[in-house]
């Protein structure tokens, strides 16, 4: 019997893993689908990466992902690449002497055995989406970019193992190439929102991963997505900012944040200043929202608040990005329950207290957590009476 689920709110999860040498995220997708009598379809996953071209900040790319459905057609998860997972792959390839003179090639430095595992790159996200819409994730590589080439009425050029499309003036539109060796191994498990039975639902995904020998990579994290709607108020938003600034060290200690995780960071001091100023002046939510939006926050912080800064976000969630990498469902939901209790405290209009001076950060966070859980119990008791 699974352990009682400590988590009670609708939550989506992103769990970063790494396939063993010779396996892939596709292998895990097929294993999970088989265990549920379901199916797997290939989809595109969009992300960005630093550009090696001088003067160009980043490329956008589409890479192969695998969406899993059970026998009823219900989505279980999507498995995608995560470009932050690099150290284990680099270390394995270095140990195997990949790339050295005389090396004959091995599973670590051979491309993905799937001949149609490709990625599409562009420096313009709109063009990338158009390329994906006109190509389709299940297109054979020899036909990749045919669709967007027809849109611009130009040919697809082949340069070695690269397919590319340029407009009539020679400006790059998009290019496609095989997935680099090793990039089939990173596996971010992205779940749909889970309303109940979180531990059991996660174990249905992580059990097969453990059986196949999947690992927690060096840079791994687990991200939580919770409904953003309740946090669209001045008191709630202010409390969230105070939680992730004043109690940052304590949160990292209690949750066990991975110091090697990338694409996280402290909320800027300017945000704290704006929130405190607007709160004291009696600002309403639209005014605070506009003031914070002007700061240009990114998602790559300890907590991603960007969805709260618009009333029509593509994904209406608050994203917590500081849980460590884990391969056990109960470990994940146990830490997620801590986050849930603290965020529910943020919904209480009473201002979140500042950490007491001279008290160690972890101890201060535990005191706040105890208060948050006591408030939870007080809310639950009338319903049980």
Locate the predicted segments by residue.
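C-terminal accessory/tail domains of diverse enzymes
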Residues: 1-215, 229-385
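Active-site histidine-anchored catalytic micro-motif
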Residues: 219
